């Protein structure tokens, strides 16, 4: 009796699903990629409960015939390759024929499809990989795939799902990446009846960037272009003044496929050279066209990692393209633009409970280097999610020059202004910053800071400053040299540490509320973690699509620090993911004290320097900054006399003692 058996097809598909389908976002990725391969120009993704309850992908592509429909659920059945040679010149996103059978094996699947040549369409219903219904039906040309009760027959997989908001953020990220990879396709994402993302499908990548990352971000992106005999590189990268705290905003595309590649990420950063601050990363969309023979995509279950021939040459091409584009730009920040950015913009006061999430109607005019708007008219006879666009008139509206007539009611309504992100060039370069990913080191730092005891500080008489960095003072024990940045950092750390927890009745109403823009996935993640921000006195309310409004701020935060402070806190929260209130407050106090302290080469007058020393003397631990660096060093009178050889011990020279 043989002990080796061939596994049933359904079981084999479930095993394959373990590699291909990790979460609802994996299903969306595979099915949308199939829609792209079917030459669709419009794709709508609808989900419920972040996709765990239902996902529906509708496209207007080529569709499938009645005969091909049941074959699509067979493993390794595909229309995209037919011979071994095809495997080495793949231009489609899918080719293995594994995704649809894998999805069908762990869910209830319904497919409606029709081709342009067929008299009627077809419907297929399968549960757990077994076909239960296959018959003719009337349906538009294209394909509609509905996935329900994902992982219903593999409950162990459900234990590894994160919260609904986290899973939704993954879905939004997948749709955003595919939208950037294919700006010629109109994408729509709807979650629980709310529209989260919509792109116009005009083929303009900058316009897609504006719809995903916001208008202000898109305006600070510059295009890159370069080519050699093997590669064509295009896309957009952000100016050095526009950065993020992680690499999540870097999108690398090869032949329309989003991939992850450490070396190409490195090439992007090398293109910026020293223009980026340490720990900051650009926003970038790099579109690479390559001969399929030079790329092997058949090395990873999800095809997000590929092998590239001549990878070093491609890295050099990317770095050169970015550095040359940046060289042509005026990288000096425009003071007038910064002033205009902080000016108020009037809006009529909305009803927060009924604020609609409208699709972005921003369109980019490359000749005028600006955006304009279109009015969208939806026909009742059109399929859901597919819009017919009509220009308002022959003259487009310039977004920046759009003026709203002020009626009496609008004049009485409060104004709002868009908050600007902190300039990384103004951040602290003296510290590497918090290593939030090294939990052990962070925990040790927080324990040390928490267990500090009150110290006795000597009386100091300030008398000078050197190089705008070090303060000189004398005391009973000799000469003291103080690092002014570390000193103020310690003072501010103890201030913020004490004040951040006092948020119950310490909120001040803003005369002009601020608006904070985020990408779709970050917006969703922040909504889930909003309670942590509330604990430190930051109350952000959803205000339209991908935007929060701040109406009040904690007393401990100065109004001049609101814009940069809130963005920094949100970035920290997105980086740390899971953090206790206590740890978050401590991290926040360290971060804010470091960012808000005076830097090197900053001259202080006598009064300011003496006040800093008085404040330092009142600190619980005036001898170290929160990172552990010394705040001051001391040369005693004896040390000075030895250095000047006024005294020598046992007639032994200082050089012989090894000191000089």
UniProtKB/Swiss-Prot annotation:
NCBIfam families: mutl (TIGR00585), PRK00095.1-3 (NF000950)
GO biological process, one term: mismatch repair
GO cellular component: mismatch repair complex
Domain of life from the UniProt record: Bacteria
Pfam families for the chain: DNA_mis_repair, HATPase_c_3, MutL_C
Organism in which the protein naturally occurs: Streptococcus equi subsp. zooepidemicus (strain MGCS10565)
Name of the protein this chain belongs to: DNA mismatch repair protein MutL
GO molecular function: ATP binding; ATP hydrolysis activity; ATP-dependent DNA damage sensor activity; mismatched DNA binding
Keyword Repeat: no
